[in-house]
Swiss-Prot record:
GO terms for biological process: regulation of DNA-templated transcription; response to stress. InterPro entries: HTH_MarR-typ, Transc_reg_Sar_Rot_HTH, WH-like_DNA-bd_sf, WH_DNA-bd_sf. Belongs to the SarZ family. Activates transcription of virulence factors alpha- and beta hemolysin genes (hla and hlb). Also, activates RNAIII expression, a central regulator transcribed from the agr locus. It is found in: Cytoplasm. Residues 9-139 form the HTH marR-type domain. This is HTH-type transcriptional regulator SarZ. Residues 55-78 bind DNA. Gene3D superfamilies: Winged helix-like DNA-binding domain superfamily/Winged helix DNA-binding domain. The keyword Cytoplasm applies. Keywords: Activator, Cytoplasm, DNA-binding, Transcription, Transcription regulation, Virulence. Changing residue 96 to A: Reduced DNA binding activity, hemolysin production and virulence in silkworm-infection model.
């Protein structure tokens, strides 16, 4: 177990990096069954069952730009998890929605978070505190809707 009093162990960015990498590794083990990457997983989980979401709004939800989302959405469409349709009023706007298969896997995908949580040596209270602190950190410091 890594607990060290070194320069890196005191760096917020490094601790985020290690945590993110290791958590994603755990998710990846479960996502193989669905032929999904972690990024594909968060995109599917960000789309509500009966929602049509434009690519810009989806990107804001998951902090990804259209250059990253477009190839990912094409892969998800080939797997029959999402469908991409052009908006009638403005064909430049692409609408993303879940297919029946995409809706069907949302429940088992949501259970992955519970499975991953159970692999950690952490209480529900500690997890809740971390989530609240990180949500606060993200909301105070990052706004993906900002123009770059």
């Amino acid at each position: 177990m890594y607990v060290e009093n070194s320069y890196l162990s005191k760096q917020l960015c490094f601790l985020f990096y290690v945590s993110s990498k290791e958590i994603i590794k755990k998710y990846t083990n479960y996502l193989k069954e669905y032929d999904l990457t972690y990024t594909g997983y968060i995109v599917l989980m960000a789309i509500e069952n009966d929602e049509k979401l434009n690519i810009k709004k989806l990107g804001e939800r998951v902090f990804l730009d259209s250059g990253t989302l477009t190839p990912l959405l094409k892969k998800l469409e080939k797997k029959d998890y999402v469908v991409r349709t052009r908006e009638e009023k403005d064909e430049r706007n692409l609408q993303i929605s879940l297919t029946e298969q995409g809706k069907a896997i949302k429940s088992p995908l949501a259970e992955i978070s519970v499975k991953v949580f159970n692999e950690f040596n952490i209480s529900e209270r500690e997890a809740s505190d971390i989530i609240n602190n990180l949500r606060n950190f993200v909301s105070k410091n990052f706004d993906y809707s900002d123009k770059k």
